[in-house]
Amino acid sequence: MGQCFNGFLNSFSDHLYDLNGVKAQIGMRIVKTQAEVEEAKLKGETVFLVKDDGVYINGSFSNASGNVYFKGENVAEVIKNAKLGYDGVNGIPINAWEGIILDMSHIELDNSLMSHQSWRNYNFYMEAELALLQDIGYNFDRKLYYGDSIYESNLLNWQSDHGYYARKDGKWLIGEYNPTEYGVSLHIYSKNNIATQSHDILSSGVAASGIRIDGSNNQLIIANDTKVYTLGDYSNALLIAYGKDHVIEHNGELKATGKEGIAINIDFGDNTLGNAEEYRGSYIHQMSGNNQDDLAEYNLDGVLVKSLNLNAASSTIGSLASIYIADNAYVNTINIAQWAKVEGDIISNWDPNNEKLANQYKDSFYTDLNFGSDSSLSRAAFNALDNTWSVKANVLGYDNFKMNANENLNLQGSAFVYDLNNKAHFSLLG
């Protein structure tokens, strides 16, 4: 007879669906192939399909080894129309097979804390995971932890419609700081989105992130006068944590002034299971120290941030760093417009000759760090020293920063860079 849903369905299994949209039912038989589904159909039987082939579909956001999905009211509220997992199903992918054992218990959102994957860079639940907990009966205010999440892809005009503040009785207390640890106002999980944050984000919680970006090819626009303040210790105003080809247009205020606060943190992070098990970064994928030839499958075959643009109206303040780039994260270009306010070190630990890079990628990826515009019109005031602008930062990127001073600039700090090209009046005041 094989396996089936015996006895009763608990609050979790009662929300399970297969890739054909069939809901789990008591006594329903579980099969492994579509051919078995069709055979059962001819006999008037509805069966539950759980494939065990583990075939990867390019562009999927899960490497789960099964094809089961969790659906519920709260989950639907969070993921909306997102198609997730191998099969592009509107539900949370669940790992079905544990070797030859039918498991159907582990959430398989990419890289998540609750997944059963060998590489994870979350220290807290995703909003979809919290929604799942609500659907199985837990009662709490999910919005204390997440303001918004984008699980859908190809949204070309996503606009925020509220900020992130303290909560009471299920409502935002506008203007009051949210004290929740690990809180995130906006999480972009998916790909090919253009998202504009135009409402304030106020957090005082430890290890919070105002905005977190994963996925690939996402563009984030922080609107003029928008405040993203994460004042708790070890917090980030903006965290770019996974993927490739992201673009940032920063016109607002990013501030992270607690202990070791980082305004813009660009970092894949460490594997919560240990880096010796599996390690990921830009153009880097290692298993047990050995390079893997599957970068595209895991959205690692590109620059993490294509362009980081701090525009003239922007303010970027961090107690540890205004901009921090980890040794596993490649940023192609940083443009800091004249008069942009920057307070806090600009740090890059990326090394184009990182030993974890495969040989074909070594000595190829440097970061252009541009202060001011490179246009001839903007440099017409070359001799007008009253146009000099000040940046309060040490610039620390000896291995990879190619720094261009395109406008009159007083750097109130030191510069340790790979290359310096001065096209205007440049002063070091550190």
Annotate each language-model stretch with its function.
Residues G2-Q3, G232:
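Alpha-helical hinge/cap motifs
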Residues Q3-S160:
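Extracellular zinc-dependent metalloprotease catalytic-domain scaffold
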Residues G7, Y138-R142, N217, V417, ...:
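Broad hydrophobic/π-residue packing in well-ordered secondary structure
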Residues D14, E45, D53, G66, ...:
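Generic intrinsically disordered, low-complexity segments enriched for polar/acidic and small residues
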Residues D141-S153, F401-A415:
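Short domain-boundary/entry signatures in modular proteins, especially
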Residues W158, H162-A208, R212-E343, W350-N383, ...:
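Surface-exposed loop/turn motifs in large extracellular/passenger domains
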